[in-house]
Amino acid sequence: MGGEVPEPRRLNRALSFDDWVPDEALHLVMGHVEDPRDREAASRVCRRWHRIDALTRKHVTVAFCYAARPARLRERFPRLESLSLKGKPRAAMYGLIPDDWGAYAAPWIDELAAPLECLKALHLRRMTVTDADIAALVRARGHMLQELKLDKCIGFSTDALRLVARSCRSLRTLFLEECHITDKGGEWLHELAVNNSVLVTLNFYMTELKVAPADLELLAKNCKSLISLKMSECDLSDLISFFQTANALQDFAGGAFYEVGELTKYEKVKFPPRLCFLGLTYMGTNEMPVIFPFSMKLKKLDLQYTFLTTEDHCQIIAKCPNLLILEVRNVIGDRGLEVVGDTCKKLRRLRIERGDDDPGLQEEQGGVSQLGLTAVAVGCRELEYIAAYVSDITNGALESIGTFCKNLYDFRLVLLDRERQVTDLPLDNGVCALLRNCTKLRRFALYLRPGGLSDDGLSYIGQYSGNIQYMLLGNVGESDHGLIRFAVGCTNLQKLELRSCCFSERALSLAVLQMPSLRYIWVQGYRASQTGLDLLLMARPFWNIEFTPPSPESFNHMTEDGEPCVDSHAQVLAYYSLAGRRSDCPQWVIPLHPA
């Protein structure tokens, strides 16, 4: 016995996890796996798991509409209940992508609306959607559609909305924020109020749609479950009856104070008792008291479209200690941010948008600098999201954010060019410290000024951004060498946007080849050639390259070393696609592919 050598342990496939777990159990387990990355990993275990993932997947997000074929999606996930689809590059939001660029919803709706019999929710973002597309969707899915989100879309009219309102009686969410909609009358809202009794969320914020306050009141009477309304401009004094009726309302944005300074006109405005998310338009100093009675209850406050001064911001925010989300313009100033740091200890999201470019106003009100950001970092240590336009910034402020804001998953900073001199450039050490310490970061954007980040700083971003999946960089680096050093470290980066950088087409191509997880890159403003031939160095299977040439005027301008100057017109879009080259490129976009 003592001299016997035990047999080596062998894995018996008959006893493997895959074989003894029945399909029913795997269906249940898969039903609780929601993270798409976990889903993808599970589907690769074996064919059986792949099949069960296909049958149990409830939601899919297609991050770029040209990355997949609608027919393949239908075959792969026949029981989808929810689909999100993104179209044009983010630059479309800033006027850098023309309307006729593409991203048409028609192929997706025509292919999927009828066959996906379980589809209850559709979210389209930055896409061209026509009345005919919406009509096709309503014909196929109107009887069971619960959620329709058209986010920053173009191409449709209120005729289509009227059809949705009349036919989709199970609709719980209708989202139209920042859509360009042809207004053919407000009947759509009346139809919605008459035909729907289950609506929870209605959003037509930042559109130019005109509606009748009486229809909003009727909607509130018939939809007792209405929790969120974000609307276009409408005088707040005309919404008094609506607010009295909408007792369940928790989230309101829009309306307007059309007669700023009229002390008595808005005295009777009383918000519903459960309201805790608020954004008001054109509010001035005299209208602030309308918020004070329930300011302690506010969890979200949006002051981006108000006429408030820095002092007004200080006064309001001091009364809102329970804020989780704050959205303002940079008129809040460093003083306002100091109040935020002292008061809003629970704050999770802070957005500081660009304000008025009038230098006189900025001198009077201040603007945001390293002082304000440092105060927020020290005082609001639960922050998960910061997006800020700043007039000045230092390495020390970025280090403070890295030291105190350990929960950050999304950080975006834009350094404005209105100041002649910035205190502390380059920002290499500050960026390095922020990335090293904020290990939960998944999204990172840094738009600076020339000289804002050296090649060393760019390499730090690559070295310490191992978990970041999306990145936007502008005016960073000094040479092609810096870009290559950056790319070597970006092992998990999936989406990259570059603007106003000094890189050549060859360097861009070599950088792409260094990033193994990259699925999408968009570049605007670089040292472009007239043909884009060096971009073919990044060519590989399933990789589409689309090139917008530089303007002829800029192409004739060369740097001292004979290289093309940075051209703001030239663009590159490259992405993985299982659908092949797209067939709807406009004439001014040139698809590049090896001969």
UniProtKB/Swiss-Prot annotation:
Extract one GO cellular component term from the record.
Answer: SCF ubiquitin ligase complex
Which tissue types show expression of this protein?
A: Expressed in roots, shoots, leaf sheaths and leaf blades.
- Give the InterPro entries listed for this entry: COI1_F-box, F-box-like_dom_sf, Leu-rich_rpt, Leu-rich_rpt_Cys-con_subtyp, LRR_dom_sf, Transp_inhibit
**Alphabetical UniProt keywords:** Jasmonic acid signaling pathway, Plant defense, Stress response, Ubl conjugation pathway
The UniProt induction remark is:
By the leaffolder Cnaphalocrocis medinalis infestation and methyl jasmonate (MeJA) treatment.
Q: Which CDD domains does its entry note?
A: F-box_AtTIR1-like
Q: Which GO terms describe its biological process?
A: defense response to insect; regulation of jasmonic acid mediated signaling pathway; SCF-dependent proteasomal ubiquitin-dependent protein catabolic process
Q: Where is the F-box domain?
A: 20-62
Does the keyword section mention Methyltransferase?
no
Q: Where does jasmonate bind?
A: R90, R351, Y389, R412, R499
Under the heading Pfam families, the entry gives:
F-box_5, LRR_6, Transp_inhibit
Keyword Iron-sulfur recorded: no
Q: What else is known?
A: Plants silencing COI1A and COI1B show increased plant height and seed length, are hypersensitive to gibberellin, and display reduced sensitivity to inhibition of seedling growth by jasmonate. Plants silencing COI1A show early and reduced tillering with few grain filling, and display increased sensitivity to the chewing insect Cnaphalocrocis medinalis.
Functional summary from the UniProt entry: Involved in jasmonate (JA) signaling. Required for jasmonate signaling in plant defense responses. Can complement Arabidopsis coi1-1 mutant and restore jasmonate signaling. Required for JA-regulated defense responses to infestation by the leaffolder Cnaphalocrocis medinalis. May act on an initial response of jasmonate-regulated gene expression toward drought tolerance as part of a BHLH148-TIFY11D/JAZ12-COI1A complex. Component of SCF(COI1) E3 ubiquitin ligase complexes, which may mediate the ubiquitination and subsequent proteasomal degradation of target proteins, including TIFY/JAZ family.
How this chain assembles, per its entry, is: Interacts with TIFY6A/JAZ3, TIFY6B/JAZ4 and TIFY11D/JAZ12 in a coronatine-dependent manner. Interacts with TIFY9/JAZ5, TIFY10A/JAZ6, TIFY10B/JAZ7 and TIFY11C/JAZ11 in a coronatine-dependent manner. Interacts with TIFY11A/JAZ9 in a coronatine-dependent manner.
Q: What is this protein called?
A: Coronatine-insensitive protein homolog 1a
Q: Which organism is it from?
A: Oryza sativa subsp. japonica
Organism taxonomic ancestry: Eukaryota, Viridiplantae, Streptophyta, Embryophyta, Tracheophyta
- State the encoding gene: COI1A
